[in-house]
């Protein structure tokens, strides 16, 4: 972990150095480029002070390739003349016949002032951009310095050995490390010396050295980051699949499913349960209409058949809409399950952080509260009254996805699944909880009796 952290910090420092060096070179070049363009923007003043031999030498393009490097004035003049000719002037067939007056007329006083104003605006704009970039680079450098200081204090504390062991144990779950999320694990493995003794000695040593305040501050920040990351991740797991599936159901799936079902499908019911319900409701409607006819003592058989037909059409429309909703529920459940699976697979490290945070909360409770919550969960799922709750839950799920309600299947599920849960829970108590905290097990058995 230390090696990967040091490598990452080194890469960030190296990138920061390269960026600063590049900005320095660009600033130097931009500053001197505008100065040279302004200083030598009128090469006629240089040309008038040249000798006839030099004038004849610079009139040819070959001088650019054979110029004397020791003659800086001639070099500057020819370079600027050649540059302005390439970017602003048209080429003639004969370079020797090019009139210098066309070149020199460009560099009058007005163009000189305009170029000066443009250069000042350009440099002020670039300076603002450089100031923003320098502020960002300074922020990055300050963050790296804070990271180095925190790392120094963290690894110098005697009690930080326990926290480092937690980090190493949790980060061994994955191959890579997320530096943005501080991760810890809630408990350590069982050693020969009880960890309560080592923890007390470490805290006593920290009090003697005078590092307790910094240690408490660091643990508080670590717990804060862990809690925020866990709550954020659990919020995504709970609300993001529901939010995406609801939007896709309303705006994407529902119009297409309705069009497909009403145009391509000729059936109304998906299963026999809907047919039985529709037939039962139709019989009830007919009985009510016949009862009204008998009470009123009127013979309107034609009106009665029309009313029965209207009620039948209404029932057909109702159960047709129910069939569409069943298909939509099935598709949205598949979308929600897919999104939830993707979030769990992508956020394995955040899931480990959430797991450690939940375990930390659980272990921070007293033994009585731990036993109370264990009893509450066990009685809720595998207790005496749990079969009725399981029947309601399974029936609602079957109705939601469009399956027929079968009491024999539900009874078989209720008679087997809670037994499996009870076996798994007892194994967890025997295997894990009994070693972790025997006092919780004793309190649990006492309250259960």
UniProtKB/Swiss-Prot annotation:
Subcellular location: Plastid, Chloroplast inner membrane
Chief place of localization: plastid
UniProt cross-references to HAMAP family, sorted A to Z: CemA_PxcA (MF_01308)
BP term (GO), one: potassium ion transport
Membrane topology according to the record: Multi-pass membrane protein
Any Pfam family: CemA
GO molecular function: antiporter activity; proton transmembrane transporter activity
Free-text function comment from the UniProt entry: Contributes to K(+)/H(+) antiport activity by supporting proton efflux to control proton extrusion and homeostasis in chloroplasts in a light-dependent manner to modulate photosynthesis. Prevents excessive induction of non-photochemical quenching (NPQ) under continuous-light conditions. Indirectly promotes efficient inorganic carbon uptake into chloroplasts.
Gene name linked to the record: cemA
Organism: Psilotum nudum (Whisk fern)
TM helices/strands, residue ranges: 9-29, 227-247, 326-346, 374-394, 410-430
Protein's name according to its UniProt entry: Potassium/proton antiporter CemA
Lineage: Eukaryota, Viridiplantae, Streptophyta, Embryophyta, Tracheophyta
Keywords, ordered alphabetically: Antiport, Chloroplast, Hydrogen ion transport, Ion transport, Membrane, Plastid, Plastid inner membrane, Potassium, Potassium transport, Transmembrane, Transmembrane helix, Transport
Family annotation (InterPro entries): CemA (IPR004282)
GO CC, alphabetical: chloroplast inner membrane
Domain of life: Eukaryota
Annotated family: Belongs to the CemA family.
Catalysis performed (reactions): K(+)(in) + H(+)(out) = K(+)(out) + H(+)(in)
């Amino acid at each position: 972990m230390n090696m990967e952290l040091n490598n990452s910090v080194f890469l960030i420092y190296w990138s920061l150095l390269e960026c600063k060096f590049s900005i320095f070179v660009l600033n130097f070049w931009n500053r001197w480029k505008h100065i040279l363009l302004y200083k030598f923007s009128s090469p006629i003043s240089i040309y008038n002070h040249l000798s006839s031999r030099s004038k004849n030498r610079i009139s040819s393009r070959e001088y650019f390739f054979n110029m004397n490097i020791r003659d800086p004035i001639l070099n500057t003049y020819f370079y600027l003349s050649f540059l302005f000719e390439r970017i602003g002037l048209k080429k003639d067939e004969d370079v020797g016949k090019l009139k210098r007056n066309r070149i020199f007329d460009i560099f009058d006083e007005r163009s000189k002032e305009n170029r000066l104003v443009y250069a000042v605006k350009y440099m002020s704009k670039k300076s603002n951009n450089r100031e923003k970039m320098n502020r960002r680079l300074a922020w990055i450098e300050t963050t790296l310095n804070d990271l180095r200081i925190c790392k120094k204090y963290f690894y110098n504390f005697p009690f930080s050995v326990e926290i480092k062991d937690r980090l190493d144990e949790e980060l061994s779950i994955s191959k890579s490390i997320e530096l943005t999320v501080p991760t810890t694990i809630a408990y350590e493995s069982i050693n020969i010396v009880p960890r309560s003794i080592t923890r007390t000695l470490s805290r006593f040593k920290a009090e003697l050295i005078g590092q307790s305040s910094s240690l408490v501050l660091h643990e508080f920040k670590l717990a804060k980051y862990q809690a925020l990351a866990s709550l954020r991740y659990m919020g995504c797991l709970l609300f993001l699949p529901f939010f995406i599936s609801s939007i896709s159901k309303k705006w994407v799936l529902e119009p297409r499913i309705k069009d497909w079902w009403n145009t391509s499908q000729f059936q109304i019911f998906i299963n026999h349960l809907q047919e039985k319900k529709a037939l039962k409701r139709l019989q009830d409607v007919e009985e009510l209409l016949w009862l009204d006819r008998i009470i009123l003592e009127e013979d309107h058989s034609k009106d009665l058949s029309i009313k029965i037909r209207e009620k039948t059409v209404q029932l057909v429309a109702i159960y047709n809409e129910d069939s569409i909703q069943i298909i939509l529920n099935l598709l949205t459940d598949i979308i929600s399950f897919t999104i939830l699976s993707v979030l769990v697979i992508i956020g394995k490290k955040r899931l480990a952080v959430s797991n450690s945070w939940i375990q930390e909360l659980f272990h921070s409770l007293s033994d009585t509260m731990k036993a109370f919550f264990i009893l509450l969960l066990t009685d809720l799922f595998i207790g005496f009254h749990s079969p009725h709750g399981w029947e309601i839950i399974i029936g609602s799920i079957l109705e939601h996805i469009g399956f027929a309600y079968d009491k024999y299947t539900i009874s078989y599920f209720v008679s087997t699944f809670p037994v499996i849960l009870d076996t798994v829970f007892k194994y967890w108590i025997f295997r894990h909880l009994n070693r972790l905290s025997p006092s919780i097990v004793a309190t649990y058995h006492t309250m259960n009796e």
